[in-house]
UniProtKB/Swiss-Prot annotation:
Pfam families: Neurokinin_B. This is Tachykinin-3. Coiled coil: none annotated. Residues 21-83, 99-126 form a propeptide. Residues 1-20 form the signal peptide. The gene is TAC3. InterPro entries: Neurokinin-B/TAC3 (IPR003635), Tachy_Neuro_lke_CS (IPR013055). Keywords: Amidation, Cleavage on pair of basic residues, Neuropeptide, Secreted, Signal.
Amino acid sequence: MRSTLLFAVILALSSARSLGAVCEESQEQVVPGGGHSKKDSNLYQLPPSLLRRLYDSRVVSLDGLLKMLSKASVGPKESPLPQKRDMHDFFVGLMGKRNLQPDTPVDINQENIPSFGTFKYPPSVE
């Protein structure tokens, strides 16, 4: 949901900038006499009522977008514990069983763990 909203914001901003660049470019067109005409520059200025109607007719208004963003950021926050638990489950799936009581120390019997120096080959290999 947030990525879609972010994409919509970026798209709206980029289209607004590109439209602004086109408008600036059209205002800078040179009159064949060699200079800018004041009458021509007035043609590119739109009346405020028309601009207001264009702004209101857009699919996503800036106010609506800001309201949606504020609602998304104010929404109930989930604790990070479920995500941590999911990641733990993922790594446990890769590595082995989960320890049900993480606070109790696990006694490791050193006799059951072979070290690298005590590895013996079976008699059939010799």
